[in-house]
């Protein structure tokens, strides 16, 4: 195949982006060649053609984002190569450059994103310590976490629902195994070596300004270098890194996030969906962050609660505030798109509309005394009003973006175009008079431009200044110096309008960039205002109460599960009292009775209080917990090659390693993944260790042997779920009371589940026979005892 200059250019650029699909702009299309073309054709279901024996597939430039989204979702990295000069102005080969590398974690376009964060994670490891830097390129948020605990790192990666992992080569295979559905890319070590990247990105004189460890600084440097590589720019929109530290926030492992159904996942209804009545995208993202990182500082928690209480107490102003917030747009992402030169005219309209709301919001804020006055750039509002159409059509350069009156020069060119048809009509009339040809017609087509058309019957009347341009079957087409001059002016006006709109739009965007810091601070303040007002709205809507904090007392009166109550009629409220003297609760009772719901609701009420929310209870006095741990349910870990029981023991090992006297531990059926004897022994030993540890524990179990703990340890109290029997019917009241379950009601639960009557009747026969045999052998007559006791009474 003969290599043309164009193909040489393509191959040279492709060499620099071997690991990406290269979309190469050719006129009105982005073309892919060779293997890239085959992939594009298959993924996008478009025709594969050939150009000089090279496989080729193309997509229209105006539909790029639609096709790009499909390629990225299919797991491909895509390099966009654009024409850097107008074809009409270049007689040589057009200069082309890659302007963007698109990966799942580097997307900023609105149509690609949901309201939630789109996190990329850069992961590094050095001498047994792990560092993860999370970045949402679309908002500029940067979070840093460092730990010597590999599982804690994996938990955070799972909790943040990351879209992309970037890591050192030696971590790539293990991370791919753990997160098979996440796009994972390895980078060379030199990404981690240039700490000057941090200084330049944040304009720092001293790199230690952030108080990050050497490993964290290296990982942050790698993130910065990678974002520069994908966005093809030195000017980044990155906020100062926020350290995820146990000193400030409760660290939640992924099991707890999943077991308590905190955020959307595989388990359907969740706490975030219940609480998320936010009015802004920024607020929704912040609420999710608060749920994943509850506070551990009592003063900070109480400040949030006080703000929520003030909002609850002024419902009229609260409603007004939320009405205004509902018109606030995603300022955070708009600023990011402007910074990366990816904004569209509607972004600037949305920004203006948001800024116009701020004075009205400030009036309402003065009623509360909770929030500071919102600062915003008034001069920018004025500029956006004058510059950008209220309803811009198309992109800059298409003549419908910049307002009339903003640029007198642009208005002149527009006037010329708008009156072109009128002037052509005048010219046509003048030529008809001059030539005496009444059927003379002035027209235009894209190939020949403007022309005068005369039928062949009238050719003897044409003046000397008519220059033949095209011959048709029944007529001839001509041009005159005057018409040629008019055409030149029109073409120049069209070109100049396109250039000027692009230039003016860019200049307005540059003005927006100058106000970046103020706009990002405004976005932060609006998000916080939205979350606090949402928590107040939730408190009113769901009848929540303000929690009070105590050093060691956990007292909940009329507690409810915030998620289950939303989807259940007549939810049964329950009480719990724990302190340092009585801090370990063993809960027995049959399946379906509500044991799991009860212990989860205690965890959720505690967590909600620590994000600054009112809670579903009549009264709540709570300690501030440093961690909430859960071990619930039976599940295996196929990706990690772990059985159900091994997963259970791994999670218990984490709890025994990390829990303190300030932790809340929620256990459901620990020890059920092995034999009964082994299970009871392990559960008893774990209970002893947790009692010594001093943490507050709620342990739901079918092992009635564990109720004997109360006789050995004064810290233990037994609870059960009240069950009523009416004839052959069993009623689960879901009410937690003092005491021990006297039977399991397993057959009754099977009956409720729809097991056929013949199977149920046979189960009763077997149960009766087994207990007769057991009574003869042991001399005991407790027909309903669930287990043979292992420990002496």
Swiss-Prot record:
UniProt entry tagged with the keyword Acetylation: no
UniProt binding sites for ATP: 589-596
Its biological purpose: This protein is involved in the repair of mismatches in DNA. It is possible that it carries out the mismatch recognition step. This protein has a weak ATPase activity.
Family designation: Belongs to the DNA mismatch repair MutS family.
Gene encoding the protein: mutS
Keyword NAD found: no
Entry superkingdom: Bacteria
A biological process from GO: mismatch repair
Molecular functions per Gene Ontology: ATP binding; ATP-dependent DNA damage sensor activity; damaged DNA binding; mismatched DNA binding
Record Pfam families: MutS_I (PF01624), MutS_II (PF05188), MutS_III (PF05192), MutS_IV (PF05190), MutS_V (PF00488)
Provenance organism: Thermotoga sp. (strain RQ2)
Gene3D superfamilies: 1.10.1420.10, DNA repair protein MutS, domain I, MutS, connector domain, P-loop containing nucleotide triphosphate hydrolases
Designated name of the protein: DNA mismatch repair protein MutS
């Amino acid at each position: 195949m003969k290599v043309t200059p164009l193909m040489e250019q393509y191959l040279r650029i492709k060499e620099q982006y071997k690991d990406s699909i290269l979309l190469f702009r050719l006129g009105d299309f982005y073309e892919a060649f060779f293997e890239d073309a085959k992939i594009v054709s298959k993924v996008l279901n478009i025709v594969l053609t050939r150009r000089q024996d090279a496989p080729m597939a193309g997509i229209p430039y105006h539909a790029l984002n639609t096709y790009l989204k499909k390629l990225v979702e299919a797991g491909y990295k895509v390099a966009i190569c654009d024409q850097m000069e107008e074809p009409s102005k270049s007689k040589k080969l057009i200069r082309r450059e890659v302007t963007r590398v698109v990966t799942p974690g580097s997307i900023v376009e609105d149509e690609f994103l949901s309201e939630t964060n789109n996190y990329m994670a850069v992961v590094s490891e050095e001498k047994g310590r792990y560092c993860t830097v999370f970045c949402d390129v679309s908002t500029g948020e940067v979070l840093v976490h460092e730990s010597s605990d590999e599982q804690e790192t994996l938990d955070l990666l799972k909790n943040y629902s990351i879209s992309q992992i970037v890591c050192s080569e030696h971590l790539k295979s293990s991370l791919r195994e753990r997160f098979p559905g996440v796009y994972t890319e390895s980078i060379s070590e030199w990404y981690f070596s240039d700490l000057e990247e941090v200084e330049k990105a944040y304009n720092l004189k001293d790199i230690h300004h952030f108080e990050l460890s050497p490993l964290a600084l290296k990982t942050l440097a790698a993130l910065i270098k990678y974002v520069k590589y994908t966005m093809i720019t030195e000017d980044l929109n990155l906020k100062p890194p926020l350290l995820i530290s146990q000193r400030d926030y409760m660290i939640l492992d992924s099991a707890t996030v999943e077991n308590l159904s905190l955020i959307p996942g595989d388990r359907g209804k969740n706490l975030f969906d219940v609480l998320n009545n936010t009015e802004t995208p920024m607020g929704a993202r912040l609420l999710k962050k608060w749920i994943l990182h509850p506070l551990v500082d009592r003063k900070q928690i109480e400040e949030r609660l006080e703000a929520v209480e003030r909002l609850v107490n002024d419902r009229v102003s609260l409603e007004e505030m939320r009405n205004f917030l509902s018109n606030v747009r995603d300022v955070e992402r708009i600023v990011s798109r402007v910074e990366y030169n990816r904004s569209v005219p509607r972004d600037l309209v949305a920004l203006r509309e948001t800024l116009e709301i701020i004075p009205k919001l400030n009036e309402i804020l003065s009623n509360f005394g909770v929030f500071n006055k919102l600062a915003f750039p008034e001069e920018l509002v004025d500029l956006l009003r004058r510059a950008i159409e209220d309803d811009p059509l198309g992109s800059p350069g298409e003549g419908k973006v910049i307002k009339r009156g903003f640029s007198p020069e642009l208005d002149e060119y527009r006037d010329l175009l708008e009156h072109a048809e009128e002037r052509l009509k005048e010219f046509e009339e003048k030529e008809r008079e001059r030539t005496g040809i009444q059927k003379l017609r002035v027209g235009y087509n894209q190939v020949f431009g403007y022309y005068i058309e005369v039928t062949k019957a009238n050719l003897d009347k044409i003046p000397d200044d008519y220059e033949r341009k095209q011959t048709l079957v029944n007529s001839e087409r001509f041009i005159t110096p005057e018409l040629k001059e008019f055409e030149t002016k029109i073409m120049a006006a069209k070109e100049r309008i396109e250039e000027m709109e692009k230039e003016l739009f860019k200049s307005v965007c540059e003005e927006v960039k100058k106000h970046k810091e103020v706009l990002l601070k405004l976005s932060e303040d609006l998000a916080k205002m939205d979350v606090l007002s949402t928590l107040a709205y939730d408190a009113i809507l769901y009848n929540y109460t303000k929690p009070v904090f105590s050093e060691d007392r956990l007292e909940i009166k009329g507690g409810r599960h915030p998620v289950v109550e939303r989807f259940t009629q007549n939810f049964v409220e329950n009480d719990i009292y724990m302190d340092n003297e009585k801090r370990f609760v063993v809960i027995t009772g049959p399946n379906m009775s509500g044991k799991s719901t009860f212990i989860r609701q205690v965890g959720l009420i505690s967590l909600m209080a620590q994000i600054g929310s009112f809670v579903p209870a009549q009264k709540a006095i709570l300690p501030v917990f440093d961690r909430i741990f859960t071990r619930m349910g039976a599940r295996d870990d196929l990706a990690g090659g772990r059985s159900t029981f091994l997963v259970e023991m791994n999670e218990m090992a984490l709890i025994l390693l990390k829990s303190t006297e300030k932790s809340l531990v929620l256990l459901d059926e620990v020890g059920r993944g092995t034999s009964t004897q082994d299970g009871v022994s392990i559960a008893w030993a774990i209970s002893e260790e947790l009692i010594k540890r001093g943490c507050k524990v709620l342990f739901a179990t079918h092992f009635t042997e564990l109720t004997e703990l109360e006789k050995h340890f004064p810290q233990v109290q037994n609870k059960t779920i009240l069950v009523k029997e009416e004839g052959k019917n069993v009623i689960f009241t879901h009410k937690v009371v003092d005491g021990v379950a006297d039977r399991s009601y397993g057959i009754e639960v099977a009956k409720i589940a729809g097991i056929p009557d013949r199977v149920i009747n046979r189960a009763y026969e077997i149960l009766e026979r087994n207990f007769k045999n057991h009574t003869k052998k042991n001399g005991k007559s407790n027909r309903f005892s669930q287990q043979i006791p292992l420990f002496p009474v």
